[in-house]
């Protein structure tokens, strides 16, 4: 049976328990939101195929448990990941502080060239905010990675975050291929117009 995709990207969602990783995953994969998700036990994944630059890209997105007792399970899944989203809850200071710990785990266990992005989730709950957008932006700048604020509940920037990460992974792959090509021709990566319409980019921030 012929493959229905051109590329397969393995992505990870990591962060403390309760920051909304499962909700972000379901919003992107199912366009659904459920406020009664229990904490993920172990690891689960969802698949969604998107189109970038005329290529079909299958995203295999792993939802890893944030609790400390599952850390030994999740670290086995860092290897092979091409993109990692580090998620914190803007209403939970501790989850933001722990992003640095998660980054250390990535540096220890993941591929050196893995694409990373920080997501400040639950930006719809601004009246309970404990972490300013500027602090999220500065943290991302410190590590040289991208940042967005998202809301799985209000469907803000979730689509855009996954497309941005996938686009960066594909651009890096294309650059490597060009380096091995005698022509060295360039290939731009674009989000389709249809997908652009589905994003909610303007309501929260992107760095």
Swiss-Prot record:
Predominant localisation class: membrane
PROSITE patterns: RAB
Tissue-specific expression: Highest levels in spinal cord, heart, kidney and lung.
Residues recorded with modification Phosphothreonine: 72
Post-translational modification summary for this protein: Phosphorylation of Thr-72 in the switch II region by LRRK2 prevents the association of RAB regulatory proteins, including CHM and RAB GDP dissociation inhibitors GDI1 and GDI2. Phosphorylation by LRRK2 is required for localization to stressed lysosomes.
Regulation (activators, inhibitors): Regulated by guanine nucleotide exchange factors (GEFs) such as RAB3IP/Rabin8 and RPGR which promote the exchange of bound GDP for free GTP, GTPase activating proteins (GAPs) which increase the GTP hydrolysis activity, and GDP dissociation inhibitors (GDIs) which inhibit the dissociation of the nucleotide from the GTPase. Activated in response to insulin.
Enzymatic reactions: GTP + H2O = GDP + phosphate + H(+)
GO CC list: actin cytoskeleton; centriolar satellite; centriole; centrosome; ciliary basal body; ciliary base; ciliary membrane; cilium
List of residues binding GTP: 17-23, 35, 39-40, 66, 121-122, 124, 152-153
Membership in a protein family: Belongs to the small GTPase superfamily. Rab family.
Protein's name according to its UniProt entry: Ras-related protein Rab-8A
Source lineage: Eukaryota, Metazoa, Chordata, Craniata, Vertebrata
Gene name of this polypeptide: Rab8a
């Amino acid at each position: 049976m012929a493959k229905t995709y051109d590329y397969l990207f393995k992505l990870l969602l990591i962060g403390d328990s309760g920051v909304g990783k499962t909700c972000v995953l379901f919003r992107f994969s199912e366009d659904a939101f459920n406020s009664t998700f229990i904490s993920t036990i172990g690891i689960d994944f969802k698949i969604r195929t998107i189109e970038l630059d005329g290529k079909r890209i299958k995203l295999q997105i792993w939802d890893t448990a944030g609790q400390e007792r599952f850390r030994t399970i999740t670290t086995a899944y860092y290897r092979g990941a091409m993109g990692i989203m580090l998620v914190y809850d803007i209403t939970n200071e501790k989850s933001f502080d722990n992003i640095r710990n998660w980054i250390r785990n990535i540096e220890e266990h993941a591929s050196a060239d893995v694409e990373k992005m920080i997501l400040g989730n639950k930006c719809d709950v601004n009246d309970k905010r404990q972490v300013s957008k500027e602090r999220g932006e500065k943290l991302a700048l410190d590590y040289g990675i991208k940042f967005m604020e998202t809301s799985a509940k209000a469907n803000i920037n979730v689509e855009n975050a996954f497309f941005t990460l996938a686009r960066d992974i594909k651009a890096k792959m294309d650059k490597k291929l060009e380096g091995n090509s005698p022509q060295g021709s360039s290939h731009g990566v674009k989000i389709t117009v249809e997908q652009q319409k589905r994003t909610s980019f303007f309501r929260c921030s992107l760095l």
